[in-house]
Amino acid sequence: EREKLGKKPIEEEDDHDDDDVSGGKTSEQTVSTTDPDAGMFVKGEHERQFAYEAHTACDKRGFVLGVEVTAGNVHDSVAWDAVYNKITSGFECVKYVVMDAGYKTPWIAKKILEDGRIPILPYTRYKGDKERYKPWEYEYDPVNDSFICPQGGVLRHTTTNKDGKRTYRTTPSKCKSCSCKFKCGANEKGQKVMTTHIWQEFLDLVEAIRKTEKGKRLYTQRKETIERVFADAKEKHAMRYTHYRGLAAVTRWVSLKYAAMNLKKLANWSWDNSCLYVILAALPHNMTRTPIFA
């Protein structure tokens, strides 16, 4: 795309650069002295603690299919590839992938759709200024690769950066005298700048899927499946806090816990469908029972 716009191609970054250097500036990172593998987990404005995250996937019956344990400061979308590849390699029959808003990225939407599967992702609230024009109020012109603002101004495609973001700009001389300039968020020169991802069409398709009856019905099952897995793991299997140090030890511990949860669910199913359960269920229930404590 950059060559079509007369721009130089983006050169690959040097792999030998220091990891803690970004754009010529050093970055600071909070590290635990007790467990350096743990990461600072931030949730909301008040919750900050060193933790691990178990990125988990399950089927519609609540059986855990795969898990990827990372430090608490690793975003869900970063750990997604490892979980997705692990599950799809073992269960090729997967057709629908239901996830929360943390996985709503262009890459994830593109990957799932190109694999012939259907992603189900939730609605995400618009976080911009409510008094200004919304992104969906700009009409896209595929012929000229430009956007038309509500007042008729044209935003031309000027460049594409290394993050896959397309930048569209208006002509300052044409928008400087616009009476609605404050509503579009133009700068002092009267120029409106708008960015969109090169894979935005995949997110648009995900939005269309979300509004279907199938998409609404499948997403409501999250609270009955994966959220129940998390609840049982924390409340019944002591997974609210880790008892080990180091990523390898925590990964083994989480995997063993999930294996036990799967076996427990399978045992309950086998008992409910057994002949002995049917016989005992038919017996009178007014007999005195001896309490058992565990």
Language model feature labels by segment:
Residues 1-294:
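Anion-binding and metal-coordination hotspots
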